[in-house]
């Protein structure tokens, strides 16, 4: 499934809850957390309390060295029962293909991101296409919790994303 929303809508809080519930329901279940960049994977580990988050490249064995271990690892299905990938909007078609081809039957996948932020550098807008295809369950978080109720930052960001140039001004 997909969880999407603007900054401050609670994506990280939802992830923490998913992990907590999953651990209670499936105490022996294998969980893998990944993100496209080292910074995003570290932030994911810190915010969820799950210290095994890693980059997609590392998790898929797509290291810079072309050694036998990486080649073998690239062909094996991921052993996880639950795979959560944060910042999926940054994933291009090549990396998405590598990722999806490694999912074992029965694994649960949660893709998280904001399609209006950090698009992939490579070809393809995979996250947006998955959201729009109507084949994958999508949860859109649209209430902003990070800013105060009087803040106009979130409103203006939404207006800009919609192409609206009439912005509101206030104390922040």
Show where each model-derived region lies.
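Walker B catalytic acidic pair
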Residues: 87, 113
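Inter-Walker segment of RecA-like/P-loop motor cores
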Residues: 31-81
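Hydrophobic positions on the alpha1 helix immediately C-terminal to the Walker A/P-loop
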Residues: 14, 18
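Hydrophobic anchor at the beta1->P-loop junction of P-loop NTPases
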Residues: 3
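Conserved helicase motor core of P-loop NTPases
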Residues: 115-172
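Conserved lysine of the Walker
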Residues: 11
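The conserved Walker
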Residues: 7, 88
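Post-Walker A helix-loop "phosphate-sensing" segment adjacent to the P-loop in P-loop NTPases
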Residues: 21-30
